[in-house]
């Protein structure tokens, strides 16, 4: 096996094979259940695909079944052929005399096991690992996932096809075609954008009662984005925020908007404190599960007023602890905001980003421009 670690050495007249393998998740032997790929010659403008599914003759756990959407993609796996020598030879013929493009070394290891078992010459295989490429170029161990890189490359991801090996190989092919001529600066800009891209799985510190403080930091999966418009309790109770539910990498239409409750509160002469406490509880509930965006700098004074009001009305003390989804650092009440010019510089160029972030960025740009004029 030969490793190609320089993307500039890959020429248009070489055959490239983009592969993805799905396998069982047994504690013992991981067996291949799908081998898929695209073979491409850029200069000749030729491309064809390979897609085979196999009966692993092995128990498949529920996690893998859910991940691979088994009922749809492998509903008749018992009737599928075994991965025998003939099938292995077909795979070998598909990848030989080409540069094999992978994402991580998992696929190349599975091919090594397969070809070694059947005595095929694995030494003739040349491969290029896109994951290692980013790891080396960006000097980071936190390389974006295949699907995050797909989004960053401008691919419109069909989330219903994820973890179908043929579709994953297609995404890999598109990523490679996007990055092959990018400069180091352009690759780094992609990565900087990734820092602000909502993740499928992430954790957050969350609002905790005083009696829970001794338990330390409690982590929870972030399920929502909270976009805070106003957080002002000087002359009125202005807790204006919108909540979006996470849907894969992006966020849905708002599932909650506090403006209606604020209108009700402003129209009430009595029982307004009851409504304020109700709204505060909704705020705390979503805050415990949310990444937070705001165009306002939430001062210590305003935070103290809000928390003091809540304690007076409920006799319950709340402590605000939030880990921002993007910047990966604790946001304290005194700087409870994302405010960085870099967000505008990177994200505003990308049309994929969700509309609520566009709204935020436009407002922030106006604020920043005004600050520059004032200075």
Swiss-Prot record:
<dbReference type="InterPro" id="IPR013520">
    <property type="entry name" value="Exonuclease_RNaseT/DNA_pol3"/>
</dbReference>
<dbReference type="InterPro" id="IPR012337">
    <property type="entry name" value="RNaseH-like_sf"/>
</dbReference>
<dbReference type="InterPro" id="IPR036397">
    <property type="entry name" value="RNaseH_sf"/>
</dbReference>
<dbReference type="Pfam" id="PF00929">
    <property type="entry name" value="RNase_T"/>
</dbReference>
<dbReference type="GO" id="GO:0004527">
    <property type="term" value="F:exonuclease activity"/>
</dbReference>
<dbReference type="GO" id="GO:0003676">
    <property type="term" value="F:nucleic acid binding"/>
</dbReference>
<protein>
    <recommendedName>
        <fullName>Uncharacterized protein UU112</fullName>
    </recommendedName>
</protein>
